[in-house]
Amino acid sequence: MDDLTQVKVKADGHVATVTMDNPPVNALSRTMNDELTLALDRISETDEIRVVVLTAAGKVFCAGADLKGRAENIKGPGDFMAHNRRTRECFHAIRECAKPVVCAINGAALGSGLAMAASSDVLIASEKASLGLPEVDVGLLGGCRHAMRLFSHSRLRRMALTGMRVDGAELYRLGVVEACVPPEALMPKALEIARTIASKSPVSTRMGKHTLNVIEDMSLRDGYRYEQDMTAQIGKTDDAREAQRAFAEKRAPVFTGR
């Protein structure tokens, strides 16, 4: 994906590392927004890639919206709605990516950065990471609906109404992230988890992520019924049969993604 300028994509085996690179603070510019959406859409349709690691270059994961660029892009009728549509589709591209997304939060993830993390599947934080909703300080509203998936009622409202940040250690204590590690250990830990996921049947992980997304907004009864229906579909795949044969034969399975 050499045609991208603010997003770098590097594939290693079945894992693709997607790195946001828009100095100095990886603000979500229109270019980075569109390139991140495009990169994830391409990865969704690339069979060789089974897992994504989403991270950022530099000391900041994403400082939020590019306010200067926002003003330049919103000048006439329809511009504001188009801007909002592009922004939300960027987050949906993460959540709806056919491949699981491991988010390696290397620094502050604020506003849009928090929404990106919340849209991912597995979150890992550096000791220098933090999540926050600073929009109240600039007369805007943040991604509170995304943050609701991570934080309790009181903590979310405190963050939204005061602009407070939650650091990596506290994120781990709250169970928001799977681990809080020294900066130099962040990518090794994220890649370790990604490679473990990549070793599983790509059919199961793809359909599993889709199912988790769908049942999140369902009742217990409807959600579990849907999960059972999806389990029946997965059970008919070649990968499911291979997994069962491998288990019986006490060997590692060889998955084909079918």
Locations of regions flagged by a protein language model:
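Glycine- (often His-adjacent) and acidic-residue-rich active-site loop
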Residues: K8, E35, A56-C90, A109, ...
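Catalytic-core regions built around general acid/base machinery
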Residues: A39, R86-C97
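C-terminal alpha-helix plus adjacent terminal tail
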Residues: M1-G13, N22, D47, G163-A169, ...
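Crotonase-fold acyl-CoA enzyme core
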Residues: H92-T205, K236-T237, R241-R245
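Conserved CoA-thioester-binding segment of acyl-CoA-metabolizing enzymes
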Residues: M1-A57, H92
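Terminal peptide-recognition signature
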Residues: V18, L36, L54, D66, ...
